Amino acid sequence: MNRNLTICFTSDIHGYFSDMDYATGTPGTTGLSRCASSFPHDGNTLILDGGDILQGSPFAYWLSREPVEGAKVSAQVMNLAGYHFVTIGNHDFNLGRETLESYLSHLDARCVSANVEGASGVERTAVVTLENGLRVGITGVTTHFVNLWEKPENLVGIKVHEAFPAAAAALEEL
């Protein structure tokens, strides 16, 4: 039996959900909508994101005026794109824990990060069985430099451990 796996991976979307170039008012060449339309939605494809969703674009800035509600909108967009798994990027902490957890709680996708502890909705690892019977282990890591870069008040109750040892431990679990 042929057991193929297709992985579609994005990272650093930074709220660029549309391909609209806001400066010119014309379609641009980037944005989640440009690549998400080509994602296969079958039982042997995993759609993954490496984080940095909540901050960066003019639209993300507009959403950040009401960050908890804005995070729900970002999650809805990711849901429409059909993501299965995401991890947390360093900029996903920028709007605080409540905003991050709002985003994660409204996702259809599961969030995996082997080195983030204390945030609701984060799993260390996951295993899925594809339609063709292939079992796939999934994990992610978040840069531990978040501990240096992020405002301490945005990390209250959250620990971001060293990435490489956490990834090695997750691999052993899988």
Can you annotate each of these PLM segments?
Residues 1-174:
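Acidic, metal/ion-coordinating pockets
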